[in-house]
Amino acid sequence: LCPEGVEELRALREAVEYPAAGRIYSSPMLRCRQTAGVLYPGSEVYPIEQLKEYDFGEFEGKTAAQLEGYPAFSDWTSGKISAPPGGEDTKEFIKRLCVGLNRAVCDMMENDITEAAIMMHGGAIMMLLSATAVPRRKTVDWTSENGRGYSIRITPSLYHSSGIVEVYGTV
């Protein structure tokens, strides 16, 4: 995170009441771990590999404007292909995120943790919630600003039988 980003998160931490968390899980990527450190100072961060952001392959680091003339980009955004060249298949991405969430849930149950926070990338949050959350929403309807997110409730019997989580608030 750049110094301005750290300050922005510190100001947000002072202005917003973040949920209590007995454990902090995170994407292993540096900016998520740093965000966790700012929002939950002094807490140990438990990285979960499967919570990493999407692998955009050849599209990585490029803006949509830079990719406009690239035929594979329009094929990918229109759904003609399921992955950017050299990138991750969208269905595999969702499966991976669900495995990551399940790792966190199982760890919580094994360690008698009832409240936790998960630091993830915006696109990963959107994809995971569009696949698992009620109320049901389109992927684009699960956006959140940096340092913000959603509060979810996991009912063990419902989660283990269907993979469903309930979103009940925003942070």
Model-predicted regions and their roles:
Residues 10-14, 94, 98-109:
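Generic structural signal for well-ordered alpha-helical scaffold segments
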Residues 1-43, 90-91:
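Active-site-proximal alpha-helix that buttresses catalytic centers in soluble enzyme cores
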Residues 22, 112-122:
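Generic beta-sheet signal
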Residues 135-163:
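Domain-level recognition of soluble alpha/beta enzyme cores
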Residues 26-27, 95, 119-120:
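Short beta-strand scaffold positions
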Residues 38, 127-131:
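Active-site signature of alpha/beta-hydrolase-fold catalytic machinery across serine-
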Residues 39-98:
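Phosphate-handling substructures
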Residues 163-171:
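Acidic, His/Gly-rich catalytic cores of divalent-metal-dependent hydrolytic chemistry
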